[in-house]
A protein has these predicted regions:
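Acidic, proline-/serine-/threonine-rich low-complexity intrinsically disordered segments
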Residues: 1-29, 34-35
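Short solvent-exposed coil/turn linkers within tandem alpha-helical repeat scaffolds
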Residues: 46-52, 82-89, 118-128
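Residue at a conserved register position within TPR or TPR-like alpha-solenoid repeats
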Residues: 26-27, 64, 101
Length: 136
């Protein structure tokens, strides 16, 4: 069931780039993670066809991972990895899926994600992080 929007979330302005930027600013400038999560949720619901969707899912995954909600984080990173194959956020999302699997104690699954990043995106920072995470 969809959760009702909290009053903390700014209403959608009708401009996807403005709404996305406001949500990102809540994270980067204001460090207000409690408000950023509903802001990204609102963005995803308001602009289902936006080119900024993968970024919004990635940010939500990152915020939820930081709060220790690995299940929710995993869902957002999987969305980026599976639905947005051309997104520049995809290698990082796959890497984060590996990090979550490792934290869940599934080293084999973690290494599969890490190897996927290294193989598909060899010259990225995500690949370097994956290499380190595998102990290489």
């Amino acid at each position: 069931a969809p959760t009702p929007a909290t009053p903390a979330a700014a209403p959608a302005s009708g401009s996807e780039s403005n709404d996305y930027e406001s949500a990102v600013n809540l994270v980067i400038k204001e460090k207000n993670y409690a408000k950023a999560i509903p802001a990204f949720d609102t963005f995803i619901a308001s602009y289902p066809n936006s080119a900024l969707q993968p970024g919004a899912h990635y940010w939500l995954g990152q915020l939820q991972l930081n709060q220790g909600d690995r299940e929710q984080a995993k869902a957002h990173f999987l969305t980026v990895a599976q639905k947005y194959k051309d997104s520049p956020k995809r290698p990082e999302a796959i890497y984060k899926l590996g990090v979550i699997a490792k934290a869940d104690g599934d080293k084999e699954k973690a290494n599969k994600f890490f190897q996927l990043v290294i193989k598909q995106y060899p010259n990225t920072s995500a690949a370097q992080l994956a290499q380190k995470a595998m102990g290489g």
